[in-house]
Amino acid sequence: MSGASLGPVLEKEFGKERSAYHLTADYTWGWSQEGSIKKYTEALGWETTAAVKTPLGAGDFSQYITPVLNSGADVLVLNHYGKDMVNSLTQAVQFGLRDKNINGNDFQIVVPLFSRLMAQGAGDNIKGIYGTTNWNWALQDAGSQAFVKSFGAEYGNPPSQAAQTCYVQTLLYANAVETAGTFYPPEVIKALEGFKFDGMGNGPTEYRAEDHQCFKDVLVVRGNENPSSQFDLLDIVQEVPRSQVEYDSSEFGGELGPYEV
């Protein structure tokens, strides 16, 4: 979903003639993220120069960033999350990548998915970086603002994406248990399959029964160049509706398996 939502914005901001070098966390999420971004950027006309896997929790990414300098790429895509993203982005900036001009283009770094907490960890390095996120406290819909108000009253600061996700998931689980009339996992699963809801801050949302994928609106964001506080780190560039990021359930294949084992 990150690729589908981010692709048009990358085309608008950086153009169609780009060469991308991917550094990808070597596990399922990283592989999927890389595949999504490659699919949509290559459809724009971007060339994928290289796609290099990095160990989860590598810490020091210098041996992976150094080859980027001589690769001919003018975009570095960091398919990393959490501390890996903070470390790889920080080190890429320290290597001076954002100061370079390659192929007549100013070098760019893209982080397909990140949160405000990750942005805090990256500090000034996140400024101007494009990516996507699941939710942001600055959204103006009624559900988001109600949560922001109550969270702020309790904790004295705006909620993070992680806080909103945990809150929503807890409500959804409680509702599924109530609907199923039991805590027995197979019945709770059935209550969630195909469940549609709204008002939580992510637009009209559905847990698709066929593959258990949660489809919702996606936010394209950019690191704020002039934040007013430690919580004002992301600018919302575009709210991409769920309809633009959905894909057929057969695309990735596989079976979910039986309800009971």
Give the predicted meaning of each segment.
Residues K127, K196-V261:
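Solvent-exposed, acidic/polar segments of extracytosolic/periplasmic ligand-binding ectodomains
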Residues D124-N134:
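Rossmann-fold dehydrogenase core element
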